[in-house]
């Protein structure tokens, strides 16, 4: 009886393993080609007409690449780079989402839309393109004017770090699903 149970369990296991090999595609470990050792991050363009926002996003992407780029060299010039990360901050909006008892906006939501393209310089092809990165964050104004502290700048800093983490994760962990097995 015990041997029959083992044989049935083994047959069931083999059936499951062999029968479902086409039901998934493995996620890539990295889509970054092996020859890419240096990544250029030129200053992002600012179409949002918001002071220094492009600088914050560019700096955040460079810092995140240095921190998590697995030995990638990071530079700001395109010359000599194996890949280039181009970015455009398309829009910056904030709106009140919570009012105080006097009808004044107390908590604001910031929405930033950006476009990012990663290009292989050697093969002259686009590795990644997302023209609609959307990031949201919020900041709060204090009720008491003596404790007033504008949280808009820290909120933008947090969003730029989140943006950079997303971009670098995409580069380091892969762009999607492999077509071949």
Task: Please report, for each region that a protein language model flagged, where it lies by residue.
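Bacterial N-terminal signal peptides that target proteins for export
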Residues: 1-9
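Surface-exposed short loop/turn segments
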Residues: 68-72, 80-82, 86-128, 132, ...
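Bacterial N-terminal signal peptides
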Residues: 9-19
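Compositionally biased, intrinsically disordered linkers/stalks adjacent to structured regions
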Residues: 148-181
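Extracytoplasmic/periplasmic, Sec-exported soluble proteins
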Residues: 45, 49-53, 57, 106-110, ...
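A short beta-turn/loop motif at secondary-structure boundaries
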Residues: 33, 77-81
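A structural "domain/chain start" motif
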Residues: 20-70, 122, 172-181
């Amino acid at each position: 009886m015990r041997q029959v149970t083992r044989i049935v369990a083994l047959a069931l296991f083999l059936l499951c393993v062999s029968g479902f090999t086409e039901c998934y595609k493995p996620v890539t470990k990295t889509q970054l080609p092996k020859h890419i050792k240096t990544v250029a991050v030129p200053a992002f363009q600012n179409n949002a007409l918001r002071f220094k926002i492009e600088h914050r996003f560019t700096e955040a992407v460079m810092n995140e690449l240095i921190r998590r780029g697995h030995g990638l060299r990071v530079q700001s010039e395109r010359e000599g780079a194996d890949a280039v990360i181009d970015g455009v901050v398309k829009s910056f909006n904030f709106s009140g989402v919570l009012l105080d008892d006097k009808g004044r906006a107390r908590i604001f939501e910031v929405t930033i839309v950006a476009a990012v393209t990663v290009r292989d310089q050697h093969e002259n092809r686009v590795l990644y393109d997302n023209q609609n990165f959307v990031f949201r964050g919020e900041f709060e104004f204090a009720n008491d004017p003596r404790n007033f502290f504008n949280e808009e700048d820290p909120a933008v800093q947090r969003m730029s770090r989140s943006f950079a983490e997303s971009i670098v994760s995409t580069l380091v962990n892969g762009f999607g699903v492999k077509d071949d097995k």
